[in-house]
Amino acid sequence: MISQVIEVPSPLGLRPSGLEDAPDTLRRAGLHERLGSPDAVRIDVPSYDDVRDPETGILNPQGIAAVARNVAGAVDATLDAGRFPVLLGGDYSIVLGPLLALRRRGRYGLAFLDGHADFQHPSDEPNGEVASLDLAVVTGRGPDLLTDLDGLRPLVRDADVALVGYRVLDDNDHFLGEHIRSTAITVVDLTEVRKTGTGRALEKALATVTKPDLEGFWVHLDVDVLDDALMPAVDYRHLGGLTWQEATEILSGLLASDRARGLEVTIFNPRLDPDGSIAQRLCDLITNTVLRRPAGDGPARSDGYWPAHHQAHDHRRLDEPLPLLRGHGDQGVGLPLF
């Protein structure tokens, strides 16, 4: 399947520290050419505002919501063209866009490869950064401005999420980890990966995101899931993490599924990679996994059903049954929050 690179140089969920340069850096490192997508789609990003929104306490929520809708449009067009979207951030907040695009189509899963839980509640986030909240936000926890995009809260159900590679180093990590484990989210933390191996970790994640009642899944790769000694080019460093080989094995297995609908890569800060060596390794990781995807004309489901052009997207809530033939209009009742 042909890939389509979508550049989303957004620092709105964190800060403009250099991660917004990642798409251009990866292009210069040859990623776009290697993926066969020299003509990337680029999403415009509003100016960064370092003053918190008074209603939500979050930095740049309106800008993040606007970027999410624009990204959703680009992902939607890419899928309708039968291509595989590869999003390059930017910070973690860009995950809202592809999940909104998929949510408009139906019910999808999320394979969330991340060294952090990203499950803070906005009231507990000291800096107002959505980057610490993104998994909470996409599962419907937080202000309506971000959690109820297009009236479709949640973008993904807890039971349809697999968090892989998360590691615990301090009391806050432990608290968030315990909170996540009290939900229906599947957690495959770093300790479990090391204990059972990447094969079992992959099997557990796929069991969650390829359930028969899901129409596919999205893959979020936060590069801080990698070992800090190998990936120091991130703003919030965190000791330990996956090796390049472990990350390749897990990501390859996820993307080899014909249920995978796209990949998003976030948080790489090229200003912390002065010789460009990390950018080259990251290009290798992305190309070596994306290019192993099954051949085909488009994102066909394993049951053979996939409408090539969606004239009507589903706008039902995720706690309602999703019929095979979908249409506009039903809003239903949202899932409970914390």
Role assignments for model-derived ranges:
Residues S3-V86, P98, H179-H310, D314, ...:
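Catalytic cores of soluble, metal-dependent hydrolases
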Residues Q331-P336:
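Short, intrinsically disordered C-terminal tails of secreted or membrane-associated proteins
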Residues L169-R181:
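Short, glycine/polar-rich helix-capping loops at beta-to-alpha or helix-loop-helix junctions
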